[in-house]
């Protein structure tokens, strides 16, 4: 059944750059309304990587450490392209959802 009020979160898979073999990161994203997403994208250029990702992520699955601010910081330090991959997938997920609806 189609929900007029969507769930607050949704799952997605982010391909985190790792040389020739990107790593699949299963995440739970926070859903934003159209207005909130528009405002967020305007602010995003001023946010540091950690803040940017914290605002989009509600959690992750199948990672060797549970989701937390410290664990997210470790991920972003270990994988230089991680923040951009997360942000890009987040926007893509919203755009894809809008096209489907």
What name fits each language-model region?
Residues 43-101:
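Acidic, low-complexity intrinsically disordered segments
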């Amino acid at each position: 059944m189609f929900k007029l009020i969507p769930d607050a979160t949704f799952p997605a898979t982010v391909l985190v750059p790792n040389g020739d073999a990107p790593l699949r990161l299963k995440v739970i994203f926070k859903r934003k309304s159209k207005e909130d997403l528009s405002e967020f994208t305007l602010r995003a250029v001023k946010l540091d990587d950690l803040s940017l990702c914290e605002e989009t992520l509600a959690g992750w699955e199948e990672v060797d450490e549970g989701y937390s601010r410290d664990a997210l910081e470790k991920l972003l330090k270990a994988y230089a392209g991680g923040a951009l991959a997360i942000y890009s997938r987040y926007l893509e997920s919203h755009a894809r959802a809008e096209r489907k609806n």
